[in-house]
């Protein structure tokens, strides 16, 4: 019993860190400079809410099994939607062209998993659900629950991979857009994504493989929450400091100028004079759009130049 209480206290720490981060992001939302940053803030708020719900389930799993059985649909739903919303944040930050709406089909699989668990909660008797989670008996309910857990894990891995691929593609294009090497690297986001895969598989594996795994690990669970808390803090601080570069979409006017070829033709001397006078290479926040505006030219032409 003491071990269960200790485990519950350990699992409550990520709930607190997510709540504090949620408050800080919420207070900063009104300061967001543009629509894109506000979208990122709203998505982060959603992620922190889902993380709080997930880790609250781990607390219940440790101290009150009956409560966890009733809470299971919420735990499943939050765990399945977290990777999608993290991918949504990556999708917004790494946008390199026209601002496209996030495809709704990304929410279909998590929604199906949620509906499946909710149907089990309403149809299957409580004791049968309890047995499917905590006993080693074989039944249709336990098979569905185990399969759903595995799909949730695979979903987290899949969207982590998609996020990393999108960051890789973004890095290739942002090099010609901004001189801010630190902010455009997104190393912090890649680290969070990779770290989270390892973090989430450990506690979920305890549920999939059986409660005995929790007992065998014992006090080592105290160390599994450290990456979670660290992830919450790193994500919060980087969003608050806007440690990323948003590539602005090409405006209609720029498209018109590019199509007509009606922009200033840049000569070597003119560019060298601009670099000598403005010294943009000393400004870490310099963007190619700034140079295009100053030279009355087009960003595509300047990139090629």
Where are these regions (language model features)?
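The cytoplasmic-loop to transmembrane-helix boundary for the fourth helix
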Residues: 94-123, 140-149, 180-196
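Extracellular-loop-to-transmembrane junctions of the mid-late helices
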Residues: 3-14, 120-126, 134-165, 218-221
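Interfacial "cap-and-anchor" motif at the non-cytosolic start of specific transmembrane alpha-helices
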Residues: 193-250
